[in-house]
UniProtKB/Swiss-Prot annotation:
Organism: Mus musculus
Binding site for a divalent metal cation 7: C50, C57, C59, C60
Keywords tagged on the record: Acetylation, Metal-binding, Metal-thiolate cluster, Phosphoprotein
Residues with PTM Phosphoserine: S58
Gene field: Mt2
Keyword Zinc-finger: no
Name used for this protein in its record: Metallothionein-2
Domain notes: Class I metallothioneins contain 2 metal-binding domains: four divalent ions are chelated within cluster A of the alpha domain and are coordinated via cysteinyl thiolate bridges to 11 cysteine ligands. Cluster B, the corresponding region within the beta domain, can ligate three divalent ions to 9 cysteines.
Family statement: Belongs to the metallothionein superfamily. Type 1 family.
GO molecular function: zinc ion binding
Gene Ontology BP, a term: cellular response to zinc ion
Modified residues (N-acetylmethionine): M1
Ligand binding (a divalent metal cation 3): C15, C19, C24, C29
Renumbered residue ranges of the record's region Alpha: 30-61
Highest taxon in the source lineage: Eukaryota
Length: 61
């Protein structure tokens, strides 16, 4: 169980809202979770589960 994620490491979870971990280890969400995805960010759409939009896009740099 990830201490920052509300799901077991081998279970399913929805990272979009509840997950605060940088690296989700859930089998249903292998992409990293972040809140750094402005609209139109191609890299984030490929490698991030966006929690909320932000102009500070560290995972797209």
């Amino acid at each position: 169980m990830d201490p920052n994620c509300s799901c077991a490491s081998d279970g399913s979870c929805s990272c979009a809202g509840a997950c605060k971990c940088k690296q989700c280890k859930c089998t249903s969400c292998k992409k990293s979770c972040c809140s750094c995805c402005p609209v139109g960010c191609a890299k984030c759409s490929q490698g991030c589960i966006c929690k909320e939009a932000s102009d500070k896009c560290s995972c797209c740099a």
